[in-house]
A protein has these predicted regions:
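Catalytic machinery of carbohydrate-active enzymes
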Residues: 1-372
Length: 372
C-alpha cells in the first residue's frame, strides 16, 4: 500500500474514534433519504440498485441522489428519485475544501434522516455527519468509514453492486431482486426509433472507454482490429445492423473500426451523435452489446440488453455486467487484476491481459447471450 494510502487509513481510524458507530433515533415511516455517490458513470449506474431496493421498501419516501456533473446523466431522469444534489467537482478528482464544505451545506439544507455513502473516501463518509444527518450508513474500506453510524466493511471479493446493496441490508431491508436500472425518456426513445435501420436486428459495439475525471486507462481497450472483425461477423453472419458508439472524442476510433470491418453497408458510426439518454434508448432496442469495461457496458446491462464485456486490468467479478444473461470475457495473466481504487500499473506497456482475449473468445460469448 502506498505511503499516502497508509497515512489516510491511519488518520481515518483515529478520527473514527470521535464518531463511534451508534444507534440514532428511529427513522420516521417515510424518511428523507440521500444516496451519496459522486462518480463515475458506471459506479453511479451500479448504485441505482440501491435506489430500487429503497423505493420498494419505502414507496412514498423522498429519495435524493448526490452526484457529480460528469455522472449526472446516469440518474438524471430516474423515476424513483425526487431530485439530484449537485456535488460539483467533489468526488471527481481535485477539489477544494471550500467546495467540500459547500456540498455539506447543500446536504444540510435537505434535512435528511438517512444518508447512504456508497464511496470509499473518508472525505465522503464525513460529509453527512458534518451536514447533521442522524443515520449515516456506508462503506468502511480499511477503516475509512469516518463518522458512519453503521459501517459496512469492504472485505474479500464481492461485486460492487452487492457491496452497495449490503449497505441497504445493514438497515434490515431485503434486497433480493434489486439490480441497476436506467429509464430512457420518451423523447430519447422516439429519436432513436427514427435512427435505427429497419429490417435487421441491432448490435451495438463500444470500442472506446477507460476515461473518467482525472484518469485515462487505455489498457481497458480491446484492439480496434478485433472489434472490426466482430462487427464484420455480426453484419455478415448474424445479419445485424451494427452501430458503433462512443463519445465525441471517440469518432476517429469508431471510424477506424468501421473501415477495418470493410465499410459494410450495415456497419454505422454513431460515435458522438447520441446523448447518454439516447444511448440508453438505443441499447434498449439492441439484441446484443459488445464493449470494454465502461459506463456504456453498465448502461447496456441496466436496460436489460444481453451484454458481452471484454476485461483486462479490472476484475469482472467486481465490476462485470450485473445480472443474468451477460458474459464477461477475461483471460488474466498472473499480474491481473492490477486496477484498484482508480489506479493501475502504469509501468505496464504490453497490456497482456486485454491482448489475451481473442476474437473467437468474444464471438463464443456473443453466441451464448444471443443464440443464432
Amino acid at each position: 500500500m502506498p505511503c499516502r494510502d497508509t497515512a489516510i487509513t491511519l488518520a481515518s481510524r483515529i478520527l473514527s474514534a470521535l464518531w463511534p458507530a451508534g444507534h440514532p433515533r428511529p427513522l420516521p415511516p417515510d424518511p428523507r433519504i440521500l444516496v451519496l455517490k459522486p462518480c463515475c458513470l458506471g459506479d453511479v449506474l451500479m448504485a441505482t440498485a440501491v435506489v430500487e431496493a429503497l423505493r420498494r421498501h419505502w414507496p412514498t419516501a423522498s429519495i435524493d441522489f448526490a452526484v457529480g456533473r460528469w455522472s449526472r446523466p446516469a440518474v438524471e431522469h430516474h423515476p424513483h428519485l425526487r431530485r439530484l444534489i449537485d456535488c460539483g467537482r467533489v468526488g471527481e478528482g481535485a477539489y477544494s475544501w471550500r467546495e467540500w464544505l459547500e456540498l455539506a451545506r447543500r446536504i444540510r439544507a435537505g434535512q435528511y434522516d438517512l444518508c447512504l455513502v456508497l464511496d470509499r473516501s473518508p472525505a465522503m463518509a464525513l460529509l453527512p455527519a458534518l451536514a447533521g444527518v442522524p443515520w449515516r450508513v456506508g462503506l468502511d474500506s480499511a477503516g475509512r468509514g469516518i463518522a458512519l453510524t453503521r459501517r459496512v466493511p469492504v472485505i474479500g471479493l464481492m461485486h460492487e453492486v452487492d457491496l452497495y446493496l449490503a449497505c441497504v441490508r445493514a438497515l434490515g431491508i431485503p434486497t433480493a431482486g434489486a439490480r441497476p436500472t436506467f429509464y430512457p425518456t420518451p423523447a430519447a426513445r422516439e429519436r432513436v426509433r427514427g435512427m435505427i435501420p429497419a429490417g435487421r436486428s441491432v448490435a451495438v459495439i463500444h470500442p472506446a472507454g477507460g476515461q473518467n475525471p482525472g484518469m485515462a486507462l487505455s489498457a481497458k481497450r480491446w484492439p480496434a482490429p478485433r472489434y472490426a472483425e466482430i462487427a464484420r461477423r455480426l453484419a455478415q453472419e448474424r445479419r445485424a445492423s451494427v452501430i458503433i458508439v462512443g463519445g465525441p472524442g471517440d469518432r476517429e476510433l469508431a471510424e477506424e473500426v468501421r473501415h477495418l470491418a470493410g465499410e459494410l453497408e450495415h456497419v454505422h458510426n454513431m460515435a458522438g451523435e447520441l446523448s447518454f439518454d439516447e444511448l440508453g434508448a438505443l441499447l434498449e432496442r439492441a439484441a446484443v452489446f459488445v464493449g470494454n469495461d465502461t459506463g456504456a457496458m453498465h448502461l447496456a446491462a441496466a436496460v436489460g440488453t444481453p451484454t458481452v464485456a471484454v476485461f483486462g486490468p479490472s476484475d469482472p467479478r467486481r465490476y462485470g455486467p450485473y445480472g443474468a444473461g451477460h458474459r464477461a470475457v477475461w483471460k488474466p495473466p498472473e499480474c491481473a487484476p492490477c486496477f484498484d481504487r482508480g489506479r493501475w500499473n502504469e509501468s505496464c506497456q504490453r497490456f497482456r491481459c486485454i491482448e489475451a482475449v481473442s476474437v473467437e473468445d468474444v464471438w463464443q460469448a456473443i453466441s451464448q447471450v444471443w443464440p443464432a
